[in-house]
Curated annotation (Swiss-Prot):
It comes from Homo sapiens (Human). Residues 171-209, 314-340, 533-566 are annotated as: Disordered. One of its GO terms (molecular function) is carboxypeptidase activity. SUPFAM superfamilies: PA domain. This is Putative uncharacterized protein ENSP00000334305. One of its GO terms (cellular component) is plasma membrane.
Length: 767
């Protein structure tokens, strides 16, 4: 469609066609008058070409002289679209100040172009309606607008400002750009003053591009070669990647380093079924030692623990800082180990990718402490007996701060602390063997290292100063590497307060309790907690359907908070799906926590997958179920304690016991068989801190404890583990040993806590 000729100038007689004018009495009936900011509000759809920008050329060609201003004034006076159905003229519709902006309206780049383009459209179509005198009518000074710095991207070339652009296109063009010089433009001499200010025309499209084959044959190989050289230089600066050594790997911790360094201490399970069950130990042996290491001094023990080749046990001279990096092209001493790739983290910590649940005891330098049976003094080839067991899983992380800490710790790793024979316990026959006896000086805080430089706490649990210092085994979640992201649904503050109040009553008991009545407090606590409702974690399918009081259903977020900022809800076992790989114990199976476990300290046994939980003293024997067989039982001890009103710690203890460890005897409390038996608890404590209702950090803790073994004086012990506040992260377990008559209560002992680094999210998932 050919655009119409430009509008005639003032004073020119033009034959008017009456068909072009039409009187409207009701302006609301006009088509498309609802939106003044849209291009179609003034001109019907698809008529832009008919009413293009060509009509304003006659105005812009005049320049900035008085004649051009008068002509623009005449055009605005004849614009019939301005001020329709208004007593006052509208500056939005016909405001002659083209580049004016409304002060109360935020004008973006797109809306600014629309506003200016709209006013230019109004100047193209003259009208007969008068305009108010208070609106100044003028055109922008073209040459002053064009005075931009050289190389400016928003400066169009000569003649580029008269493009036909839709009002809503918002292209980066200058609506008030300079037009073509008209008859009233300055002379050539005056125009030459501004010639140096115009940028050169863009001729990039005229350049001849290179042929594709030339780019492929010349430039691409050169670029690839340069990239290879750059990567080679970067690789030279990097440390060699760590390799997993199943027996020995030297990795020193820098001397005096106050940052928490996580080191994995695991136990190998390649031959688990051969040595986890034994009938009687042959003789006491140091943990991880070969028979050749017996009788050696403590100074030689650490070297023997690491295979005799490691430098872990060497004593560093005072003030000498060992190089934390391994020597270049140096091969660590290994024997019969298989190299596998490890994950390289920020602090050069070694965490396996696939064998998160496969224990392998490793020292602070990254070397394997024990690579064969847990103790060479045991009889690994003896047949499995259902009544006896050793440590079934040793999976925890030890936080080390300096090399000296590990040296002292490694010299205390002795099997005598773990031997089931009470005569071999270093602390006497009344105290159970606990792991913290061995690791009593390992602690890293934010400001100092508690180790050989300060007074060491007692390693005897019967003494008062045993682990009396406050420990911070993890400085914070930002400084921890390898921690799993374990979601936690915290217990309600009111429920936790009632639970702690009831637990405090259990701790006030100072006399032996009749075995027939010992289950009373546990039963009462279960009755008290039976009314608790589990709302489940956000997004879970087991959320409560109960409505009201701010309790959400389905996938709604929790909004039930009390004034202290604690999130509402109840912590139960349903909140976690504990997916345990039983490859370490009894084949490839999975066990799930299917029912809430609310009895603190009372073992709740789980049989084979698919069986139900059993609580209370009248638990049937494994033979009555017919599905347990020689499988191991799992017991869960939920732990809940507050270190302060702002910090809440929640824990689970997973106890692995033998098949016939707990048996009911004529309705009385379960007792242990005459033979000695030990169980290992792995409580999982999730530590959360609240500041104004927001979770500040989330850390994992692992604690270890060993149940009291049966002795001649106490055949029916009832072990309860109650979590108390000790420092900021340590856990104290009150172990109450009872017998039929007069069995003394044993003193409480504490467990060693450390951060979790071996468990991954696949081991702990929300249901």
């Amino acid at each position: 469609m050919t655009p119409p000729p430009p509008s005639p100038l003032l004073g020119t007689q033009v034959k008017e066609d009456r068909a072009d004018y039409k009187e409207f009495q009701d302006f609301s009936s006009l088509p498309d008058t609802h939106n003044i900011a849209w291009d179609h509000s003034f001109y019907p759809f698809q008529e832009e070409e008919e009413h293009g920008v060509k009509g304003v050329e006659s105005v812009l060609e005049k320049g900035v002289l008085d004649e051009g201003v008068l002509e623009a004034w005449g055009c605005c006076r004849r614009c019939r679209h301005a001020g329709w159905n208004r007593s006052q003229p509208s500056p939005e519709l016909a405001g002659a100040v083209i580049h004016a902006r409304a002060p109360a309206v935020g004008c973006r780049q797109r809306s600014g172009h629309l506003h200016v383009r709209l006013k230019q459209r109004l100047l193209e179509r003259p009208c007969q309606e008068p305009l108010g005198k208070k609106y100044q009518l003028e055109l922008p000074p073209l040459y002053e607008r064009a005075r931009k710095p050289e190389g400016s991207k928003n400066l169009p070339a000569d003649g580029q400002g008269l493009r036909a652009v839709r009002a809503d296109a918002a292209l980066p063009v200058w609506p008030g750009g300079p037009g073509r010089p008209g008859p009233h433009a300055p002379e050539a001499g005056a125009e030459g003053q501004h010639q140096g200010q115009w940028p050169p025309a863009d001729t990039r499209h005229l350049r001849t591009p290179k042929w594709p084959y030339k780019v492929a044959t010349e430039e691409k190989p050169e670029a690839e070669e340069a990239e290879k050289k750059r990567q080679a230089k970067v690789q030279e600066k990097r440390l060699p990647p760590w390799k997993k050594r199943t027996l020995n790997q030297v990795h020193r911790v820098p001397w005096g380093q106050h940052r928490a360094c996580q080191v994995m201490l695991l136990v190998s399970t390649k031959q688990l079924q051969r040595y986890l069950h034994f009938e009687k130990p042959a003789k006491p042996a140091n943990m991880g030692q070969d028979p050749d290491c017996f009788g050696k001094s403590e100074g030689e023990l650490a070297t023997c623990l690491c295979g005799g080749e490691s430098v872990v046990g060497e004593t560093e001279a005072p003030g000498v800082r060992p190089d934390p990096r391994p020597e270049k092209d140096a091969k660590p001493a290994v024997s019969g180990c298989q190299e596998e790739s490890w994950l390289q983290s920020e602090y050069d910590e070694m965490h396996p990718r696939e064998e998160m649940n496969v224990p392998s005891l490793r020292s602070g330098s990254g070397c394997q402490v024990s690579g064969s049976p847990l103790a060479k003094g045991l009889h690994p080839l003896q047949p499995c007996h259902p009544h006896y067991m050793m440590w079934e899983c040793c999976l925890f992380t030890l936080t080390l701060g300096t090399q000296a800490c590990f040296e002292v710790c490694a010299r205390r790793l002795k099997l005598a602390h773990f031997c089931p024979d009470t005569s071999l316990w270093s602390c006497g026959g009344q105290s159970p063997p606990v792991l913290c006896q061995l690791l009593d000086i390992i602690s890293v805080s934010r400001d100092k290292v508690i180790g050989s430089h300060e007074k060491k706490p007692s390693s005897n649990p019967n003494q008062d100063d045993f682990h009396s210092s406050e420990y911070a085994y993890r400085c914070g979640i930002a400084e921890a590497v390898g921690l799993p992201s374990i979601p936690v649904h915290p217990i309600g503050y009111y429920d936790a307060e009632k639970l702690l109040e009831y637990e405090s009553l259990l701790l006030q008991v100072s006399e032996p309790v009749n075995p027939e009545l010992s289950a009373g407090p546990i039963t009462g606590l279960l009755d008290r907690l039976s009314g608790f409702r589990d709302h489940g974690p956000p997004g879970s399918s087991c959320r409560s359907q109960r409505k009201g009081n701010g309790v959400e259903t389905k996938d709604q977020a929790h909004r039930n908070r009390d004034p202290r900022g604690f999130q509402g809800g109840v912590l139960t076992a349903r909140l976690f799906k504990m997916q345990v790989s039983l490859e370490l114990f009894c084949g490839h199976q999975e066990h799930y926590l299917t029912r809430p476990v609310l009895a603190p300290g009372y073992p709740v046994h789980l049989g084979k997958a698919g069986t139900h939980w059993e609580q209370g003293p009248n638990m049937p024997t494994p033979e009555q179920h017919g599905t347990w067989g020689n499988r191991h039982l799992f017991a869960v001890l939920p732990l809940l304690f507050y270190t302060s009103l702002e910090i809440m710690s929640i824990g689970y203890s997973v106890v692995m016991a033998g098949r016939n460890v707990w048996q009911p005897t004529k309705g009385q409390m379960p007792h242990q068989p005459e033979q000695s038996c030990q169980t290992l608890a792995l409580p999982m404590t999730i530590r959360h801190s609240w500041e104004g209702g927001a979770i500040r950090e989330s850390s994992g803790w692992v604690s270890w404890k060993c149940h009291l073994k049966a002795t001649e004086a106490s055949q029916n012990p009832c072990v309860r583990a109650t979590a108390l506040r000790v420092g900021c992260s340590a856990v104290t377990y009150g172990v109450l040993g009872q017998a039929q008559g007069s069995a003394p209560w044993t003193s409480a002992f504490k467990t060693f806590s450390a951060g979790i680094a071996g468990l991954e999210r696949h081991a702990w998932e929300t249901m």
